[in-house]
Each structure stands twice: as structure tokens, then as C-alpha cells.
């Protein structure tokens, strides 16, 4: 199974924001949209960073609540690890597990086309396991 299959099921909508917004403004977006990360994009739609709940907590823990008045660009992760639509799901899962992050932007021809979370990946991996389990049971009972 590939990342494209996950995107086909969940949709391709991605919440993006500009790097000049304040941390408080973007935290408000995370709360309003009930999401754990937002992609920071340039004017052409290219990914220049990602900001997660963890990034916000880390900033507050290091420097206090004054960080909420600072630009997102000061706190976003700029070395963004990405995936492609044709990448196998297990490879994306390994990237997230090994990198200890939960959100993976999907890029096609240098453009953002989706975002998958570890929850999306686990959900689809479980569905795949259930399908395989059912197929094995049917094979055993009909043999």
C-alpha cells in the first residue's frame, strides 16, 4: 500500500500558514482546526517548515510565554522530512518512528499535495492487517 491510498481515503486538504504569523496565531489555528501540526508554505506553495504542538511546547519551556508574540519562522522545523505519493506506507511509518515526529508532508513535483499523520498510517496499516487476516481465514476454511 502506498501513501496515495491514504490520501485517497482521507483527502488532500492541508492547513498551511505563512512564516510571519505569530506563534499565538498559529496555535489558535491548531485549536480551531483540531490538528497537531501546520505546514509553513511560501507564496508558491513550497514547504519551508512545519510547526507542531511539540515545537510550541519546546519554545515555551525554553523561553517562556513571550514566544507567543514571535514569528512562527523562529520556532518551526525547517529541515522537513517529506514523503511522496508512491512511497510505501511502511517506509513512511519508519521515517516517522525513527525521526520521532507525527506528521509527514506529501510532496509531488516540489508541491505540497497532502499531509499524513502517524494516526493515518496506523489506521491504514491496521485495515491492511485485518484484510490479510480475513483472507487467511477464508483460505483456511475453504481449503
Where are these regions (language model features)?
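The conserved cystathionine-beta-synthase
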Residues: 16-34, 40-41, 82-100, 107
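A glycine-centered beta-loop-beta connector
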Residues: 30-33, 38-54, 96, 104-119
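Short, charged helix-to-loop "capping" segments that act as catalytic/coupling loops
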Residues: 2-19, 41-46
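Short, charge-rich amphipathic segments
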Residues: 21-33, 62-74, 110
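Tandem CBS (Bateman) regulatory domains
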Residues: 1-12, 52-81, 88-97, 118-143
Amino acid at each position: 500500500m502506498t501513501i496515495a491510498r491514504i490520501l485517497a481515503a482521507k483527502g488532500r486538504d492541508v492547513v498551511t500558514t505563512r512564516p510571519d504569523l505569530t506563534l499565538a496565531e498559529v496555535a489558535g489555528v491548531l485549536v480551531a482546526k483540531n490538528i497537531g501540526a501546520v505546514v509553513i508554505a511560501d507564496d508558491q506553495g513550497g514547504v519551508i517548515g512545519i510547526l507542531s504542538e511539540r515545537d510550541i511546547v519546546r519554545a515555551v519551556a525554553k523561553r517562556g510565554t513571550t514566544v507567543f508574540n514571535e514569528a512562527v519562522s523562529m520556532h518551526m522545523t525547517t529541515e522537513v522530512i517529506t514523503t511522496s505519493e508512491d512511497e510505501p506506507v511502511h517506509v513512511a511509518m519508519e521515517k516517522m518512528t525513527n525521526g520521532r515526529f507525527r506528521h509527514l508532508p506529501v510532496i509531488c513535483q516540489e508541491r505540497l499535495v497532502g499531509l499524513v499523520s502517524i494516526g493515518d498510517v496506523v489506521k491504514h496499516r491496521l485495515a491492511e492487517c485485518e484484510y490479510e487476516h480475513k483472507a487467511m481465514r477464508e483460505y483456511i476454511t475453504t481449503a
